[in-house]
A protein has these predicted regions:
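Conserved short loop/turn motifs at secondary-structure junctions
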Residues: 58-71, 75, 106
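A glycine-rich helix N-cap at a beta->alpha junction
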Residues: 73-107
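Conserved phosphate/anionic-ligand binding catalytic regions in large, soluble enzymes, centered on
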Residues: 1-5, 107-118
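N-terminal glycine-rich phosphate/pyrophosphate-binding loops that anchor nucleotide-derived ligands
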Residues: 1-16
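Histidine-anchored nucleotide/phosphate-binding helix
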Residues: 40-52
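Gly-rich Lys/Arg/Thr-decorated short loops/hinges at beta-loop-alpha junctions or inter-strand turns
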Residues: 20-32
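Conserved small/polar residues in nucleotide/adenosyl-binding loops
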Residues: 164-169
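Polar, glycine-rich mid-to-C-terminal structural blocks
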Residues: 117-152
Length: 174
């Protein structure tokens, strides 16, 4: 994940995107839905951190069609954050702006693949593209794109917290 983010941040193109794959097409898999419904703020916070790291102004959550409750909870969380000035333009008076968008999947298993997912968000048929280029170079709308799944984004805030609260080797800890 860190390598992907670093690759996107280093691209010359200034327009960049952060995308979350919440399609979870595997039969019987419900982890993404449980995170999006149980704590959508955790997912959004992780995406905001990614956006800040790569200087992206727009993020997209691609949610499988069978998760209407996830969409409702995400929309509610986004609205609350926008009302409080934590999402949108000039967050907390800073020069950081980040807008969140939700796209509903069409139920195609293939859209779990990165290039098929970005094609679907763009309004095209969700078909995989040949690689290279990878999404970090030319993803959504042919722009550098960070693409991670729900679990990855949801764990980013916790990882950062652990890094800043754990003793470091410089403190004599191992």
């Amino acid at each position: 994940t860190g390598r992907k983010w670093k690759q996107v941040a280093r691209q010359k193109e200034t327009v960049r995107y952060v995308v979350c794959n919440g399609d979870e097409g595997d039969p019987g898999a419900f982890m993404d839905g449980s995170v999006m419904e149980g704590d959508p703020f955790k997912l959004i916070e992780g995406m905001m951190i990614a956006a800040y790291a790569v200087r992206a102004e727009n993020g997209y959550i691609y949610v499988r069609a069978e998760y209407p409750m996830s969409v409702a909870r995400l929309r509610n969380a986004i609205a609350q954050l926008e009302e409080r000035g934590l999402l949108g333009d000039n967050i907390l008076g800073s020069d950081f702006s980040f807008h969140m968008h939700i796209n509903r999947g069409a139920g195609a298993f293939v859209c779990g693949e990165g290039s098929a997912l970005t094609a679907s968000i763009e309004g095209s048929r969700g078909m995989p593209r040949t690689k290279p280029p990878r999404t970090v170079e030319k993803g959504l709308w042919e722009k550098p794109t960070v693409l991670n799944n729900v679990e990855t984004y949801a764990n980013v805030p916790k990882i950062i917290c652990l890094l800043y609260t754990s003793p470091s080797p410089r403190d004599g800890a191992t």
